[in-house]
Amino acid sequence: MKTVIFILGFAFVAILIPTNGESMADADAMADADANAMSDASAYPDASSDALALANPEARAEAMAEAMAKALGDAVAEAQARAMAAAYAAAGKEKDKLIECTKEMLLAAMDYAKHKIEKHLFKCK
């Protein structure tokens, strides 16, 4: 049973790493949008309120938090679906083992995601 959990743990790391890359691409896109919004706001005094809001550090932080939450939500949903499929196959369709494997893997995925978010937030400070 521990071997199954160990193997599934590596599967989750493989699942979440590409998702993290997508999240970083989203963060890069957001940084570009921030730069564009700031240049637009300074070039045009009557720029839209969205561009001016992005120039505000608090609004930028809130927008970044929303983007991170969406990326994390997508990653967790995908991880849950894959965990169920992998655990179901590994447990040989035994309900108790399936539930136990799924709980273990979801906890591991949440710990990994928490670590990634804390690491990202530390870099932002």
Swiss-Prot record:
The keyword Secreted applies. Keywords: Cytolysis, Disulfide bond, Ion transport, Membrane, Neurotoxin, Secreted, Signal, Target cell membrane, Target membrane, Toxin, Transmembrane, Transport. Residues 22-91 form a propeptide. Expressed by the venom gland. It is found in: Secreted; Target cell membrane. Disulfide bonds join C101-C124. Residues 1-21 form the signal peptide. Its main location: secreted. Neurotoxin that causes irreversible rapid flaccid paralysis in blowflies and honeybees upon intrathoracic injection. Causes a quick and irreversible cytolytic effect (at 10 uM) indicating it possibly acts as a pore-forming peptide. Shows only weak effect on aphids (A.pisum) at high doses 24 hours post intrathoracic injection. In vitro, is not cytotoxic on the dipteran S2 Drosophila embryonic cell line. Belongs to the formicidae venom precursor-01 superfamily. This is U11-myrmicitoxin-Ta1a. It comes from Tetramorium africanum (Fierce ant). The lineage of its organism: Eukaryota, Metazoa, Ecdysozoa, Arthropoda, Hexapoda.
